[in-house]
């Protein structure tokens, strides 16, 4: 009997001792759950606020695609569908935004999630944007002395003191096939080299060498040794390789 009482007492004391710990653990778990829920709610609210019609992003005219449905291809960069991207707009950065880049109009378009609402963002308010791994900046024609580049958006292919950029455009080409008018989007990609003093289009190695202030012979020799090809599919990679080598030389 004594053994039973002692055992029962120990058991009861143990339960009493554990009860506060379990209560504390429950309170901690509940607190953690509330913290996680609050964080998720805050993140969701932040995105919704960024993408709501009254947001700073919805501060431009409605975008309307006026191209005939029969036109072959599309006018956008990469994909005809909106892509998740990041944009710097009115000195604020917005992530995870549905964006399209109309190459025919040189216009960035935002799509409101789950709604058929598209807005043209004001170009002058855009500092830059990204679509996937592609980074774009907006440059003014007079932002660089002796610039031969028009105002607009440029893809940054290589950043640095001497940078390589691409100006992508699309135009509708009209042809007649068996007495029927054929409309098709065609893309043009013009490369530019930007230095501290100028920005100009480049089509071959000679164009690049004319823009470099120093090390022209070294870059020319490197291009010959590496068998760089400044045309066709290897064009962008070859220009980037030559400029990376130039940047590695003592200035």
Question: What spans do the regions from the language model cover?
Answer:
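General N-terminal leader/first-domain-start detector
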Residues: 2-3, 11, 23-93
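C-terminal segment of classical bacterial N-terminal signal peptides
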Residues: 15-23
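A short, ordered amphipathic alpha-helix with a cationic face
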Residues: 73, 195, 208-213
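Aromatic-patch recognition
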Residues: 77-206
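Long, compositionally biased interface segments
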Residues: 210-251
């Amino acid at each position: 009997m004594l053994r039973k009482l002692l055992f029962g007492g120990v058991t009861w004391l143990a339960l009493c001792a554990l009860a506060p710990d379990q209560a504390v653990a429950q309170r901690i778990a509940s607190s953690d759950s509330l913290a996680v829920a609050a964080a998720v709610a805050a993140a969701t609210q932040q995105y919704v606020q960024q993408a709501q019609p009254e947001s700073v992003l919805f501060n431009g005219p409605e975008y309307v695609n006026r191209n005939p449905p029969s036109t072959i291809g599309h006018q956008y960069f990469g994909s005809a569908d909106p892509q998740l991207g990041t944009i710097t707009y009115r000195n604020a950065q917005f992530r995870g935004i549905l964006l399209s880049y109309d190459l025919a109009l040189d216009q960035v378009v935002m799509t409101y999630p789950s709604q058929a609402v598209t807005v043209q963002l004001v170009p002058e308010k855009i500092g830059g944007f990204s679509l996937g791994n592609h980074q774009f900046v907006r440059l003014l024609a007079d932002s660089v002395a002796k610039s031969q580049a028009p105002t607009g958006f440029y893809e940054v292919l290589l950043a640095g003191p001497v940078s390589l950029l691409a100006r992508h455009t699309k135009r509708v080409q009209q042809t007649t096939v068996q007495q029927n008018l054929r409309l098709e989007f065609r893309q043009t990609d013009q490369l530019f080299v930007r230095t501290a003093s100028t920005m100009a289009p480049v089509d071959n190695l000679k164009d690049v060498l004319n823009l470099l202030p120093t090390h022209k012979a070294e870059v020319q020799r490197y291009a010959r040794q590496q068998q760089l090809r400044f045309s066709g599919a290897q064009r962008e990679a070859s220009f980037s390789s030559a400029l990376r080598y130039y940047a590695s030389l003592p200035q």
